[in-house]
Amino acid sequence: MSLDKRIESALVKALSPEALGESPPLLAAALPYGVFPGGARIRPTILVSVALACGDDCPAVTDAAAVALELMHCASLVHDDLPAFDNADIRRGKPSLHKAYNEPLAVLAGDSLLIRGFEVLADVGAVNPDRALKLISKLGQLSGARGGICAGQAWESESKVDLAAYHQAKTGALFIAATQMGAIAAGYEAEPWFDLGMRIGSAFQIADDLKDALMSAEAMGKPAGQDIANERPNAVKTMGIEGARKHLQDVLAGAIASIPSCPGEAKLAQMVQLYAHKIMDIPASAERG
């Protein structure tokens, strides 16, 4: 089974009618709406790739970790799109969840998705309780107020913002979770995998800042120009277009070198290199007027 199919199959199972039970019908429909069809599934792909590089001796735990991470990411997107935050009408080329349903249901759907992720991790405790506990702790740490994605969103309410701290929390946290949870799922220590996740996360955030400044809404599948509209801290505002491009290159240059020693190190390096090429695929100048 391909990596894509493995991840998608695990997500479908986690959000199946059998898994959701007797949920209110609209909420039961809203949960998969917020997850399918997916984007690139970058975070769970990195997680599973790291687990495979480390031996992937417990695939059920790896799959649960990948599902929990992607559900947390999707929940954050549902909440990001709400009028209280980005007020975005489009997500992944279709109406954002609060537009397709309503705002209260979108809040509940986002909450339910992140809770479902922790349920999936708790369930796999029957397979390997030690790893499940570590995964729950790691995902909680990198989702909350202590440098997790909640902290990243909260930085936007501060008058003075450290761009590096903001990027690490807003985007980097779940990429750090991807590399560290992949290692944990395969029985490896998490700490050596921090730097790789941090670099990949920083690169994606800088690239996202550049795309927000240069690309059209049609090309991105979501509203463009949101950083300026919402007065968010961003790399382009701080460094300029060319400065942000140079910083992106510098961040990516050290990503492969930061891969810890593991049995599948060479193959993992190829995957990181592939993502680096994709990340750098940004227009040279603005596509919109």
Curated annotation (Swiss-Prot):
Mg(2+) 1 binds at residues 80, 86. Isopentenyl diphosphate binds at residues 43, 73, 92. It catalyses: isopentenyl diphosphate + (2E,6E)-farnesyl diphosphate = (2E,6E,10E)-geranylgeranyl diphosphate + diphosphate. Disulfide bonds: none annotated. (2E,6E)-farnesyl diphosphate binds at residues 91, 170-171, 205. Pathway: Isoprenoid biosynthesis; geranylgeranyl diphosphate biosynthesis; geranylgeranyl diphosphate from farnesyl diphosphate and isopentenyl diphosphate: step 1/1. It is an enzyme of class 2 (transferase). GO terms for biological process: carotenoid biosynthetic process; chlorophyll biosynthetic process; geranylgeranyl diphosphate biosynthetic process; photosynthesis. GO terms for molecular function: geranylgeranyl diphosphate synthase activity; metal ion binding. It comes from the Bacteria. Mg(2+) 2 binds at residues 80, 86. Belongs to the FPP/GGPP synthase family. Catalyzes the condensation of farnesyl diphosphate (FPP) and isopentenyl diphosphate (IPP) to yield geranylgeranyl diphosphate (GGPP) needed for biosynthesis of carotenoids and diterpenes. This is Geranylgeranyl diphosphate synthase. It comes from Rhodobacter capsulatus (strain ATCC BAA-309 / NBRC 16581 / SB1003).
